Amino acid sequence: MICSVLKGSKLFDFSAFEIHPCGKCEYECFAETEKCPYSADMEYRLLDEIVHSDLTYFILPNYCDYPCANFFVFNERSQCYFQGRPELLEAYEKVPKRAVVVSNTNEENFRQAMAYHAYEKADILFLPAKQYGKESIKGDLLTSREAVSDIMAFVQKQ
């Protein structure tokens, strides 16, 4: 949906690929970034895309009041990408971040998690399924015209 509004945008679906968490290695990356045994997975490509973008959206589900585990793995693995390259970290943090969070509960944990990803405060749209008469476990939030309208308004605002 967002890609249809923002021309030239790219979608990266975390459920379609794997980013290996840190571990099950000798932490070679602490000595030499290039030695990370997982550097060929999607982590570096995603970070490269974000660093070279004008705006980044994260669409995140809420599991137990926190972003999903994939988001934490993505965050954890970024240390290798940025290690010894402060100019890349600065470029990443300068890219404005926006998030759409499907959540019926706590918002503060998401605000804190997103705070690590940008200089500016991340702009976050919280979509509690119950507000739209839906049950989050069913995954049918986008069948609500009001939810779709709220997402479109969020994406189109300057």
Residue spans for each PLM region:
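Short, glycine-/small-residue-rich phosphate/pyrophosphate-handling segment
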Residues: E87-P128
